């Protein structure tokens, strides 16, 4: 495999960027013309002494905004750990540098738009969870890497990366098109990685979780649900648990993703908007596309649908069950488990019902395992695909339980655990295990819903606590605010970053300029004024109590009526995406 360079210096002159590879023995320099935007390969001797020099950790890519092209570089990284001798890094800080020396050629409106687009790019970059490795392919599971051809293994990291999980693929299009430049860049995944040295029975082993978020149908909680026409599911995450001991290694893979047919749940100021199933689309076609690709990549599928089997979630569960049954595909099995009903009144021990119900299937699927001499001992023949409404809180709890069961078998087979010993009895490791899975839940939740996960007290401690309920309430309030009043901007940021929307410098007006209806401006003002007057009348009583009551009732009714009108027209008051028209299923 052609590794990427690991250390760089960026030399900037008014005319060009010179990105110097600083690895031992390297003589290559990537030259970017700031006027023509052309990229070429040169040598160290071509770097002019007049340039301003700074060290950088890597090239994220380039993006076109209103002012022209911008170079995105990684300026700070933090070591996560070593994966089979390869250092895994977390990208911590970035810099977005304009090719143009000035933006004075722009109009005031263009300057404002460019500033907004820059804020969007930085919004995504500041979302925690970007990881990379310069000499190892993080986009693939252990099993996929094991089953590759010699030709595949000779490819550069950019050529061989799984496009589903390469979040800077759009930003690197120009570099990818020139193979001689491939060593100057690497795939960056988005999600979560934790690597922990652990010890049981005096035997030290490495335990790892890698969660890879798909960049297909990527987005935020309420604006991206279901699937697209290609069968890509919203909030699709591949989670791989890896254990290494004495050069032997094993991995267990699970997936999560939105219920894979066409439905939506647009924010409308209500705490829980009603999900709507599309009446005008071919659900079976989309469902088949989704599961055909899943079976091709992962083998047999066991769907664990954890949504409520009552209320607004019931139609989704019924439709999903009916569609899977209609497929008549022997590689796909459907299991519905009403998580909230089964675990109501703090009865979290009832999760074991589901774990026991799928135990035979988990035994059948197995896991990928390689002996210390490199021989493949077993492969994973199927995958559990878990989902709830968001594929976050309930999903993560179930995934952690299934992963523990797989790990129990792997550690016994490797000789770390004695026969009859259970992971749950190893207090030190159990604490590491639970906290890591809770951290995984928080990372996935922040990236999709904007806050940490719910129910992480159970993941961390093995039991539900009253403090955990309080924190869930707080996170739910934060989610409500973000989902209604800031997620449109967050969705636009992701669409711009991934190339779902491309800025055209020749456009005089961008989609950012959407005129708001008069109701959007006037009604909130009326409501605030009416409510304020109601409070003032309560505090400053009139001459008689009847006069005071009349004023309070008048202003109270005015504020209540205005609030009702706002709620009825809720979708006009939420922060909606502007750049890419999202499907409306209603």
Curated annotation (Swiss-Prot):
It catalyses: a 1,2-diacyl-sn-glycero-3-phospho-(1D-myo-inositol-3-phosphate) + H2O = a 1,2-diacyl-sn-glycero-3-phospho-(1D-myo-inositol) + phosphate; a 1,2-diacyl-sn-glycero-3-phospho-(1D-myo-inositol 4-phosphate) + H2O = a 1,2-diacyl-sn-glycero-3-phospho-(1D-myo-inositol) + phosphate. Signal peptide: none annotated. It is found in: Endoplasmic reticulum membrane; Golgi apparatus membrane. Its main location: endoplasmic reticulum. The keyword Ribosomal protein does not apply. Residues 451-586 are annotated as: Essential for phosphatidylinositol-4-phosphate phosphatase activity. PROSITE patterns: SAC. This is Phosphatidylinositol-3-phosphatase SAC1-A. It comes from Danio rerio. The lineage of its organism: Eukaryota, Metazoa, Chordata, Craniata, Vertebrata.
